[in-house]
Swiss-Prot record:
It is an enzyme of class 3 (hydrolase). The gene is hh-1. It comes from Drosophila pseudoobscura pseudoobscura. GO terms for biological process: anatomical structure morphogenesis; cell fate specification; cell-cell signaling; intein-mediated protein splicing; protein autoprocessing; regulation of gene expression; segment polarity determination; self proteolysis. SUPFAM superfamilies: Hedgehog/DD-peptidase (SSF55166), Hedgehog/intein (Hint) domain (SSF51294). The record marks H337 as: Essential for auto-cleavage. This is Protein hedgehog.
């Protein structure tokens, strides 16, 4: 009877490995009755010997399965990362041809003396105010990074390598632009004639002195290309672009300190989520595997498993947006985070960046009486600076925090595209949950071993990879820059 009960159990799980089936058969063997012809002492000795051998064999099978799990995890990650390259959606085409495909929308060159945006360079909507000149002996000099991109030519007239130094944001945008230039004009490379300047060759108020500006041209010095070069610079994400002269283009960016508050999307650690057990926990205490209240694709509340943390840092200081509703709910979230906004006139639910939610907009809030998600009007939008960031990712891609429905995603202005981009992590989590040795290994952990959530400090490697690649595959209008 025991054997008949065990076989269907293994057959009911078609993905169970041979190791798990072997362990079941070994368990059955371990508990078989000893023959009556054998003496009691011999029987005990034989059974003890069998038990020790079986325990050793089981541990070997568990270790083998764990190795297979690790290899499968690595293989699936590689395959799933390569999979999107084979069918890039039309809306994912970025500057130039974008992953081997020509862009499907027309880009119009700038005209001489045109600037984008049409604002003063030092306004908040452009590159922002000056923060002070950086010299070699300044504390901020260590924040400048060299750019050794082989696809970029640096004139470096001074011979000091100063033209290679710039802020991290400037380097990031310049590398994207270099990629676009090569795709737009094969055989032509981006030329940087000036970056960080320590010789005061510019006006008194110049972002060159802070490493936040570059003067660029093309390697062939063809003036007819410069209008389109300026347009490509806009698409690459520069915060202010000016077709200042027929000889070059001027570009600048916001300071690294001013944009650090919204490069990723997170909640405050003290914000709370409701678990399926009915317990409300701060996000700082949520662990991978917890099932928390989320919102399904139909707008109804569902409980969804936390599969990873896209960002988790309890010490980092960050700027947040505060959304207050007429029902008393308060959501504190980073500016680039996507929030579900209900449009009653259209009976439609959209996802909007938190810093673009306005008063009189409606957000979905959990009704404590019925448990349903109901629209509540936003009555005040504020800002606060607080310590710590936490960004859990659920299988649904949504989470209800402080009773307000929000996305798990940020930076990209599309809930569906962001959810599609994290599909490899959901598949990976599902595969890992099928591994037969996982529960056995977890049960062997001692109480002193901290959880994966407690061990993580910083941005998840996959989320960070997506953030870095977004500028190459998405147009600027799809990004929170």
């Amino acid at each position: 009877m025991d054997n008949h009960n065990e076989v269907p159990m293994s057959m009911s799980v078609p993905w169970a490995s041979a190791a798990s089936v072997t362990c079941l058969s070994l368990d059955a063997k371990c508990h078989r009755p000893c023959p009556s012809s054998i003496s009691a002492s011999a029987s005990a000795s034989a059974c003890a010997s069998d038990s020790a051998a079986i325990a050793t064999t089981k541990l070997r099978h568990i270790a083998y399965t764990q190795r297979c799990s690790s290899r499968l995890t690595m293989l699936m990650t590689v395959l799933l990362l390569l999979l999107p390259l084979s069918f890039t959606p039309a809306h994912s085409c970025g500057p130039g041809r974008g992953l081997g495909r020509r862009r499907e929308r027309n880009l119009y060159p700038l005209v001489l003396k045109q600037t984008i945006p049409n604002l003063s360079e030092y306004q908040t909507g452009a590159s922002g105010p000056l923060e002070g000149e950086i010299k070699r002996d300044s504390p901020k000099f260590k924040d400048l990074v060299p750019n050794y991109n082989r696809d970029i030519l640096f004139r470096d007239e001074e011979g000091t390598g100063a033209d290679r130094l710039m802020t991290k944001r400037c380097k990031e945008k310049l590398n994207v632009l270099a990629y676009s230039v090569m795709n737009e004009w094969p055989g032509v490379r981006l030329l940087v004639t000036e970056s960080w300047d320590e010789d005061h060759q510019h006006g008194q108020e110049s972002l060159h002195y802070e490493g936040r500006a570059v003067t660029i041209a093309t390697s062939d010095r063809e003036p007819s290309r410069y209008g389109m070069l300026a347009r490509l610079a806009v698409e690459a994400g520069f915060d202010w672009v000016s077709y200042v002269s027929r000889r070059h283009i001027y570009c600048s960016v916001k300071s690294d300190s001013s944009i650090s508050s919204h490069v990723h999307g997170c909640f405050t650690p003290e914000s709370t989520a409701l678990l399926e057990s009915g317990i409300t926990k701060p996000l700082s205490e949520i662990s991978i595997g917890d099932r928390v209240l989320s919102m399904g694709s139909n707008g109804q509340p569902v409980y969804s498993e936390v599969i990873l943390f896209m960002d988790r840092n309890l010490e980092q200081m960050q700027n947040f947006v505060e959304l207050h509703t007429d029902g008393g709910a308060v959501l504190t979230v980073t500016p680039a985070h996507l929030i579900s906004v209900w449009h009653p006139e259209r009976q439609q639910l959209d996802y909007v960046f938190a810093d673009r939610v306005e008063e009189l907009n409606y957000v979905l809030v959990r009704d404590p009486q019925t448990g349903e998600l109901r629209p509540q009007r936003v009555v005040r939008v504020g800002s606060v600076r607080s310590k710590g960031v936490v960004a859990p990712l659920t299988r649904e891609g949504t989470i209800v925090v402080n009773s307000v429905a929000a996305s798990c995603y940020a930076v990209i202005d599309s809930q569906s595209l962001a959810h599609w981009g994290l599909a490899p992590m959901r598949i990976l989590a599902m595969l890992q949950s099928w591994m037969p040795a996982k529960d056995q290994l977890r049960s062997s952990q001692t109480e002193g071993v901290v959880s994966r959530a407690e061990q993580q400090n910083g941005i998840h490697w996959y989320a960070n990879a997506l953030y870095k690649v977004k500028d190459y595959v998405l147009p600027k209008s799809w990004r929170h820059d």
